Amino acid sequence: MRFSNKFKKVPYLLQALLNVCLFFLALALSALLISETWYIVLFVYKSLFNKVDSYYEMLGELLIFFMYFEFIALIIKYFKSDFHFPLRYFIYIGITAVIRLIIIDHDQAISTFWWAMAILAMICGFFIANRRNSVVEH
């Protein structure tokens, strides 16, 4: 009996370790978000004077900005919802990542098609998860 009582504290210790690590990850992501914001501001400033023809790089950086933002929002939601990661935030991050991939690497039409199908699958999964939640609530 005494041996099992010691292991009852293990989940709490692991939860505390996870919380500390997520806190530092949120700080690092916040620093990267600020850095990305500065890069976007500089890019816009330079493009005003140089008349850049291609804005794919700018759009890619903007989507990276949103991915940092979504990861930070996911960590905030984790702490606000009693240490639970909502599924929809992972789907948002996945959709944003695939859209960035399509914008950056769109040379082959068939791969773009399959990436678009991946987005469609994530959207369908999102609606199924939301429908299940609304049925459970009613």
Swiss-Prot record:
It is found in: Cell membrane. The keyword Membrane applies. It is a multi-pass membrane protein. One of its GO terms (biological process) is cellular response to phosphate starvation. The chain crosses the membrane at residues 12-34, 56-76, 84-104, 109-129. GO terms for cellular component: plasma membrane. Keywords: Cell membrane, Membrane, Transmembrane, Transmembrane helix. The keyword Ribonucleoprotein does not apply. Its main location: membrane. Pfam families: PsiE. NCBIfam families: PRK02833.1-3. PANTHER family: PROTEIN PSIE. Belongs to the PsiE family. This is Protein PsiE homolog. It comes from Bacillus subtilis (strain 168).
